[in-house]
Amino acid sequence: MKITEVLSEVFEWERPGIWNGGHFYGPGRLHKVTVKTDEGVYGCGWNGGTAAERPLNIFPPFVDYFRELLVGRDPTDTRGIAEDLGEKHIKILGPAGVNTQVLAAINIACWDIKGKALGKSVHQLLGGAQSRIRTYIAGGYYAEGKGLEELQEEVRFNVEEMH
């Protein structure tokens, strides 16, 4: 199986203000990377999301940069791809920032392909599910227009529905 195409798409949508305790988030944002293969199998990865305050149109040029390094490679060689694209290019692009986020999306897309090729979910490839996990919910913060009733409802929902 070989990579034939790497696509980059940017999505943005309006949503009600969501407060994280530090500031209100703006619109929803997502950068999606799709990796396609010569066998018709494809994988998707993404970055951006709730805290993506930077303009997402800066992500596609990084995908363009990595595309020529990916086409023709075996997408199931996730470790080799991570080493070649991340570790070998760290001197050019640096150890963090946009390139790291794009590499994460590419890596997730390749893991998605690997899982599909082996008939397993990505979580199974990474060791399976746990019967219990610790959780954390932030909330109960003041926001303009939020009274005690709304605060109580938020906390009630978090305890009853989220745990």
Enumerate the language-model features and the residues they cover.
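Beta-hairpin (beta-strand-turn-beta-strand) motif
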Residues: W111, G127, A138-G140
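Structured beta-strand/loop patches that form or line metal/cofactor-binding pockets in enzymes
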Residues: M1-A51
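Metal-dependent enolase-superfamily TIM-barrel catalytic cores that perform enediolate-based chemistry
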Residues: R132-H163
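Metal- or metallocofactor-binding catalytic centers and their adjacent structured scaffolds
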Residues: K36-A117
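Catalytic cores of transferase enzymes with a strong primary signal for eukaryotic protein kinases
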Residues: P16, A96, G139
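Short glycine-/small-residue-rich flexible loop motifs, especially phosphate/cofactor-binding loops
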Residues: K32, D112, V155
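Flexible hinge/switch segments at interdomain interfaces of large molecular machines
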Residues: L125-R132
